[in-house]
Amino acid sequence: MTTSAARKGLRTRGSACPRATRSASSISSRAQVIVAGPITDKLAQRTVAHLLALAEDSDEPINMLISSPGGHVESGDMIHDVIKFIRPTVRTIGLAWVASAGALIFVGADKENRYCLPNTRFLIHQPSVGIGGTSTDMMIQAEQVRLMRDRLNQIFAEATGQPVERIEKDTQRDFWLNTQEALDYGLLGKVIRSVDELK
């Protein structure tokens, strides 16, 4: 997950758009959003605009397909929070890889609405950031990274049912999970092979 300490925001290691817009990294249709590629501010803005437009049109469930290596933490926060904010149910569907800020978006949905295709991998880890400037600035930035890490640990603990201490320990390094491991961990609700398996 990426964040930058003044945009430098804070960057993590390691898409969607309004109805009429389509691109290789962001394809949309009614009640469907595809988030693919790095999580950036621009992608987050388009995704949120699309989610809000769909929510205004209808209360029907929205399917969000996610395949991402991660990106900016704050951009992931933006999408995560709007998934919870809007009235329609959002079903997140992982494919290929759901990593870092992508995983943060993925757990914006309730556990029973988190799906993935069979060959999906998941990654969670601590945010990373380049710290620079004066000694005072570096202290401030380090404190912001600590607060972000604690907040993300709490989000994933609540999303998975794991103790915060377990999340903190597991994410000291890159923590990869296959589909069965993600199910056991509480990150994933169900593995599906067909759209017909969506409830």
Swiss-Prot record:
Keywords annotated in UniProt: Cytoplasm, Hydrolase, Protease, Serine protease
One example GO MF annotation: ATPase binding
Top EC class of this enzyme: hydrolase
Catalytic activity: Hydrolysis of proteins to small peptides in the presence of ATP and magnesium. alpha-casein is the usual test substrate. In the absence of ATP, only oligopeptides shorter than five residues are hydrolyzed (such as succinyl-Leu-Tyr-|-NHMec, and Leu-Tyr-Leu-|-Tyr-Trp, in which cleavage of the -Tyr-|-Leu- and -Tyr-|-Trp bonds also occurs)
Alphabetical list of PROSITE patterns matching this protein: CLP_PROTEASE_HIS
GO cellular component annotations of the record: cytoplasm; endopeptidase Clp complex
Lipoprotein recorded as keyword: no
Pfam families (UniProt xref): CLP_protease
Keyword Secreted: no
InterPro entries: ClpP, ClpP/crotonase-like_dom_sf, ClpP/TepA, ClpP_His_AS
Principal cellular location given in the protein's record: cytoplasm
Subcellular location field: Cytoplasm
Region of interest (Disordered), ranges: 1-23
EC number: 3.4.21.92
UniProt-listed GO biological process terms: protein quality control for misfolded or incompletely synthesized proteins
Active site: S100 (nucleophile), H125
Role, per record: Cleaves peptides in various proteins in a process that requires ATP hydrolysis. Has a chymotrypsin-like activity. Plays a major role in the degradation of misfolded proteins.
UniProt family annotation: Belongs to the peptidase S14 family.
Assembly mode: Fourteen ClpP subunits assemble into 2 heptameric rings which stack back to back to give a disk-like structure with a central cavity, resembling the structure of eukaryotic proteasomes.
Identification of the protein by name: ATP-dependent Clp protease proteolytic subunit
Organism: Paracoccus denitrificans
Lineage per the UniProt record: Bacteria, Pseudomonadati, Pseudomonadota, Alphaproteobacteria, Rhodobacterales
The gene coding this protein: clpP
